């Protein structure tokens, strides 16, 4: 019926008699709610909040990937500044539950209440996504690692052991969220249960054979959410267009939620595109996927909702330094996000908007320390062209109210005079405004294609432009051409320049349009009769033509900003792309809808965070990285402007703005990293090392509930003994002689391991980007065996995290251990890992922060540790880089302290840079520690990441900083590593990071550490 109606609407629209059919389209889709509130409603077209339709343009960030609560404001202000109406976040069960007796939502960055409070202060709705499973390229997909042993079943089902495990966490996060719902005046609008759990059906979803176990699990999650106060709509995110799970339109089977959604990563969620072919098919750059028919078939009575749409891609081990932004950069943002609009999507959340890092052991094996994700906000918190390109569309969707209710009237090349260009016509059945999303017929092609567009307007069918040069799609680009677009009390008959935003000052609208640099635009304002040029910066060939009961304007815009005024009170600002990147529309209200009278327009700065109007004073906050002008369009009553609290000397321009200038920030220089000290960190390799202390446990279990049984006994799975992260040390004892040992270790992609016998190095598995398990037959031929005392074989292995989804239970540890040439075998094994195991010795940094290296267990990485008896390291200097070297296969820990004194009223981002000197071996692994936090894993033999941003709060910008590097040499060549740091960017900023008191995030060394030697 829907498709037939759409075809009828296309025909009627072309004939100009569509109103009756449009009325039918409206009445076909009644508003729905969940029966618990009518604040959040929805229908076929969009979500509706407090009676208003909204285009939800959201972006994801993970607070646990930036564990400095003060910086959450920075990320959220940048998301808001880009025109977004919402943001989303995963809550991490793992981050809050170090063991099965603890749920911590109060310590440090584990207190998530500031996120909800910031949302209300800044004016953005929240999509809350608590799991309990989240995927997210997180260790075990966000499961706490104590559930990966098999003791809690196979997970993600209705097994009571698993239910009892997740219930305390899920109850707590649900109760917290329940206090911040939009139904009670706060800003959380939906609550997602589980994640990409497309398991409602056994086999082919079209056969609708229920998976009763999965349904029972979803019912448990739903009941918990409702029992603990959630009245918001419950949502899910299908992992792809094949699963059709949990939507009421598809089936009335159990487990259904209020609103289903679809996740999509059309250019692959990883830089390793081979991982996505089973979902997306063969990879073709910039090839789009069709969503409209999926939503029409799977959930026609619901909005086209995408809880995750590709905001970038994660960088796997072996991927390029800095990620793979080539086909997921600003062109991707321009094309694919507009494509979604052409598919009638009215709610989408970009995954990720800010990725951040994977400090400690937060990552799954698929990725390294960086979680930059090529997101619009980089992991160092800078914004780049992709951010600005995304902003151009998000600001448009925030202002285009009619876009929230449209039908797809038709699509194809018949709309254009160039067969290389196609258009999708969306039309609002109530207002008759239309949106023509234009694309290359083959979106993988990047040719420069000129075209005219046939549009149906209130003045009849027109072919535009009529006077200006043709519309162009130059490169991997898309454009949305509007007709009968309402701005304030005025109407735009059509515009071939894209709408950026608009605002109404003193009852007169200011419309902002933009074109790519050097291109032409044409627009027609209904009711206008005369136009004039008030500012021409880069404009040419300006024409005003009276027609269609209004005034048509055509012009070409090179670099700069042009301002036109019309006799009906309309002001039009036309920008080229570069100028549009530096154009902002900060809200004067915390209403996410941002009413048309509640914003100002600003051109010039690197970032505008906020604006507040008080009487005749406009207070603007933001960032400046270079000297720039500040051009402010505001109500006439504004007489003075401040920037970050300082008065700006402004003057009135002839085009109605207040204009001033902003100075560049003062430069800074980081002190050199020098005066290194070092000490061996592998005493455990020697046979006479005493492993009877608190750090060690007997590895003596003869059974396991893990579905993967070991080849040999005892069970040498580290998680079974409460040690879950990174480096673990196994000491296997045996008496008498043996010719060698066969050892098989599993640690995840890019893991490695090394072996020593009685202090003598035997061999290493160096690792690679794909191998998760590796065995070696170790020869004892050249080693010294003891005949009168026990021999000790030390196995040091790291792991790169636990696998995601069904792989979360894959063991980490020794799968098989056999002596060769010996009948007696190993007498016993001892195991050490993170100091205190699951006891959460350092609740601020958390159990995922540390591995089992001696240096970490005893706290050499912590501020305040006394290294006065250490010898100073004679580190070589390569330019400003310190080169730290040693010989032999061992682990060595390097340590220094360095002060910072960052000036006030600035935002500074700092990265460490690790390197391997030319000609030196890459057969080593290293970990970077900053004030006790492990903030980088450097595996030069495998990966390419060399730059490690470390945020303020982890770094002390007004004090001493403790820097540590643990280097594990996997060959007798030893290792040489270079280390330096650099400023990523410096901004004059309202953030004023140097003034923050963050010392509570950096607890120091305590005597308790001594017992873990």
UniProtKB/Swiss-Prot annotation:
Substrate binds at residues 90, 135-137, 195, 265, 373. The active site is at residues 196, 308. GO terms for molecular function: beta-galactosidase activity. Its EC number is 3.2.1.23. GO terms for cellular component: extracellular region. Cleaves beta-linked terminal galactosyl residues from gangliosides, glycoproteins, and glycosaminoglycans. This is Probable beta-galactosidase B. The gene is lacB.
